[in-house]
From Swiss-Prot:
Modified residues (4-aspartylphosphate): D52
Gene that this sequence comes from: rpaA
Annotated region of DNA binding: 132-231
Locations listed in the record: Cytoplasm
Source organism: Synechocystis sp. (strain ATCC 27184 / PCC 6803 / Kazusa)
Subunit annotation: Interacts with reduced ferredoxin (petF). Interacts with CikA, RpaB, SasA, Sll0038 (pixG) and a number of other proteins.
Keyword annotations from UniProtKB, A to Z: Activator, Biological rhythms, Cell cycle, Cell division, Cytoplasm, DNA-binding, Phosphoprotein, Repressor, Transcription, Transcription regulation, Two-component regulatory system
Protein's recorded name: DNA-binding dual master transcriptional regulator RpaA
Length: 241
């Protein structure tokens, strides 16, 4: 039975989420502030964390950053569930390490669909990494077991989502991949208008791979259509991390 940790100081929301998750067959644990939530994440090793942002003691952005820096919790998927719905809030959430972001008030069925998609996508291991083969094209090699890109001979460590997104683009290199297809293949759910999710992670990839992320040569935006990975023998510029 998958275990889900809810970190939220609003008992009405926590109880609503817990009841629906338990009815769907999940084991649910709760924490009411950021410090307790981080400690429980280490102790319980849940399959998914649902994280509010406006928490006592330590805010959700900071909690997520700490979870990502701790090797014991770095791979646990995080779904931010919060009343902060501005674009900048979403960008900050993804920048802090969230896998998905859902704004309150939310539809319960959509929440459950996001949970299923995250658990299905990760299963604590990204879908692309379930395949053992190394994928190579031109100057780019993806090593699934280490979530690593070899880019013009340089080793670049990727997050799980960055790896899956780059894997998706590499499989269709030279072709435009629509945001809808990316959301289906990488995040595992039917697309809505959640394009900002993709933009943030594309920006992260460009920071690691492009010599000038503001003027990308390899991961290109095809306006109105999607994104295209164009590989050439001209050297890229991301610094190994």
């Amino acid at each position: 039975m998958p275990r889900i940790l809810i970190i939220d100081d609003d008992p009405a929301i926590s109880d609503l989420v817990s009841i629906n998750l338990e009815m769907a067959g999940y084991d649910v644990q709760q924490a009411v502030d950021g410090i307790k939530g981080q400690a429980l994440a280490v102790q319980l090793q849940p399959d998914l964390i649902m994280l509010d942002l406006m928490l006592p003691k330590v805010d959700g952005f900071t909690v997520c950053q700490r979870l990502r820096r701790d090797e014991r919790t770095a791979d646990i998927p995080v779904l931010m569930l919060t009343a902060l719905g501005q674009i900048q809030d979403k960008i900050q959430g993804f920048d802090s390490g969230a896998d998905d972001y859902l704004t309150k008030p939310f539809d319960v069925e959509e929440m459950l669909a996001r949970v299923r998609a995250l658990l299905r996508r990760t299963d604590r291991i990204p879908q692309a990494a379930k395949h053992s083969e190394i994928l190579n094209q031109g100057p780019l090699t993806l090593v699934p077991e280490r979530f690593e890109a070899i880019w013009f001979g340089k080793s670049i460590k990727l997050t799980h989502l960055e790896f899956e997104l780059l894997h998706c683009l590499l499989q269709r290199h030279g072709q435009t991949v629509s945001p809808s297809d990316i959301l289906r293949e990488v995040w595992g759910y039917e697309p809505d208008d959640d394009i900002e999710t993709i933009r943030v992670h594309i920006r992260h990839l460009r920071t690691k791979l492009e010599p000038n992320p503001r003027r990308p040569r390899f991961i290109k935006t095809v306006y109105g259509a999607g994104y295209c990975l164009e590989l050439s023998t001209e050297e890229g510029g991301g610094s190994p991390t």
